[in-house]
Amino acid sequence: MKKLLSYILLALMVLGASAAFAGDKIVVAHRGASGYLPEHSLEAKSAAYFMGADYIEQDVVMTKDDKLVVLHDHFLDRVTDVMEKFPNRFRTVDGQKRWFAIDFTLAEIKSLEMTEGFKVKDGKKVQGFKARFPMGKSHFEVSTLEEELELIQGLNQSTGKNVGIYPEIKAPWFHRFEGKDISVAVLKTLKKYGYTKKSDNVYVQCFDPIETRRIKKELLPELGMDLKVVQLIAETSWLETMENKDGKLVPYNYDWMFEKGGMAKVAEYADGIGPWKPMLVKNESTADNLIITDMVKEAHENGMEVHPYTFRLDEGRIPSYAKDFEDMLDIFLNKVGVDGVFTDFPDRAVNFVRASK
């Protein structure tokens, strides 16, 4: 009898711990501590680590020589000096010159200086977020996925922490069009570094629903893996994902995800969703009248976590219905009930979550 009671108590403790973990709000460092240092630099990742982020994001694209690098766009010209160093290595897309990572070897990409993001206006580079780390200062470079995993795992060993990773497989449709299977390459790299099961501290995210389903239903089983998979959600008008129909690339239509029953369909192949904030709280909301959609409720009813993007405190990035950054966090974490947030300012989000416990 005593033995049985011991087993029951142990089981309750385990269940209690699991429930507590499941109820914890997580902070995902969006491109690292990108509000303070150039996005996706190893320096931004180190800063995010020591700010207490639960997970650190990696956007992953592929090079000409099949290496995986951490870069938000599948082109290089927004965050490096590629235009100056390789002026003729561009493609013209919709009348715009773009220097695609897939057209450069890793050695060539490593020769570039990475910087705070910018746009070119009237022939001049204009920093995207004026109050952030100054463009063109110090030295930063594009890192490989393996370099970043080794950094985070090394810090986990030296600090005794267990900070997770949150890789995004970028534009698999584009890589496939170029003859490369980026999803297999990313998953094999994760497996190499010991990320193989759901209990491991990793989420794999992707905007492409066709590919996300393939990852969950085909690739993970084939590789002997079982990871948490997150379906990112975009507006169809963003042209985030393209699909091949009758030999032509056409925009993928996300509209079904916003219909009643849409979350149940996503839950057939995903463990969570990553929606844009206005998909959860309408922009026309006011402080006295928050217009909250049913997406979080329906996702939770179907056993999925919800991690919206992107929480920023830059000028013009806090919606009018929130007083400040912390009020915005309170609305989403406590009133809407999301399970975590993607933010460029992980220190502020970590402090808020800790103070709320």
Where are these regions (language model features)?
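Bacterial N-terminal signal peptides that target proteins for export
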Residues: 1-8
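Phosphate-group recognition and catalysis centered on beta-loop-alpha active-site segments
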Residues: 19-357
